[in-house]
Amino acid sequence: MGTGRLPNLHDSGAMTPPPTPTKGSHSKSDSASSLRGSFDSVRRGNAITYRCKPSIDEKETPGSTEPRHFPYWTTDYEIEVDHKGRKRPLGCGAWSNVCRATPRPPKLEGLAPLNTVPGVDMTPPVTPVHSRNSSRSEAQVPQIPSAYAVKEPCGRTAQRVLGDECRILSYLSRYPDAEKYIVPFYGQDTRTDALVLGLMDGTLEDWIQKDLDSLSEESRAAKLAHVFPTLAAHLLDGFIWISEKHCTHGDLKPANILISSTPSSATSTSTSPPHAVYTDFSSAILSTSSTSSSPVGGATYDFLDPALMTKASASTLPTPQTDLWSLAVTLLVLAIGSSPYSRVTSNEFMKKECIKQGTPLAYMRQGENGTRNGKRMDALEGSLGFDVEEWLGLVLVKDVMKRAGVDKWRAELGSGGAKMGLRI
């Protein structure tokens, strides 16, 4: 999404397989029947968990950048199409199209020998069984959801981009709490190079447009005040979690944050703030990888740190500090409902010059939406009893040396939350 892009820029309930079956104890039809039974459960809305061979699990150690491959020899999916058999993309980008897919059993008849699948030993598909003693963390156990989002590459360059993104998602997904902060990742399909991800309700950009801006100003203000502190705190915690893994996202914006309105925990209710996770790591950089290269993906101008827009910074790569700027602009957009540079959207050159000034808080009050933006910010602050604009201004200052670090910024939000009677 966005208007312009810069080039370059598992407990006792686990389900585990029995020992490798012999020809007399595990026939092909038995395996297919068991798999179909499992998928019937998925179609009823249940997620099932299965465990791969130990030789595969060893690669799931936190810190490993070994690409995670989607186990289509055990479970497969089918891209949803319209009545004419055409794929219906959920979203389209510079490098890929994302389509909705439904889990289904693998086509055993046409399955290639498993010893030809990268990283897989020659063993028949396993039947999920209940294990009483499971020591692996749930974060390392693949689950079959009710639906996938399949990110398919567009062209050869896109294959490289998705390959790099696969390594970063594989790396991050192996750490505990990954699914709290990043999109669920099931692996790369080696048949097509597509990335198989968890399906969410939509993006933060969609949520702002459909769930906030469609309301009356009074209702919008009330709903925003209810969700803003918790959502901002969660996104900041996710930002810190990713940064601690030595990863820089490189393209933070509402379109790259996925939202789920479904209660995510036992304490969640239908009125709880939506759960948000980061997605689209096509522009990300992993500083721990000795084989990492400059990202081919790009960043979106409206959310780009002005420090990356000078001639001297032409070859400069994104950093956690530039990511923090992008997150701050993202939260500003959440507050006011549009880009602070919306008044110059039609003039790309002028917009770039405005962004270089490093004063998005000043620009948000200008143009035909300026008055509305100011009223929305004032209403949010009045409802919360917290100076949101001043808080955003701790980061949204052009001079990098004068910006607050992420720890201070998070602490200030926590202090503000305490004044609101919130623990965030």
PLM regions with names:
Residues 235-247:
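Protein kinase catalytic-loop region centered on the HRD/HxD motif
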Residues 192-203:
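Conserved short submotifs of the Hanks-type protein kinase catalytic core
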Residues 255-303:
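Activation segment/activation loop of eukaryotic-type protein kinase catalytic domains
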Residues 309-325, 329-377:
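Conserved C-lobe activation region of Hanks-type protein kinase-like domains
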Residues 95-167, 171:
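ATP-binding glycine-rich loop module of kinase domains
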Residues 184-193:
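Short beta-strand micro-motifs within the conserved protein kinase catalytic domain, predominantly
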Residues 2-89:
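Juxta-kinase regulatory segment immediately upstream of eukaryotic protein kinase catalytic domains
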Residues 231-232:
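Activation segment signature within eukaryotic-like protein kinase domains
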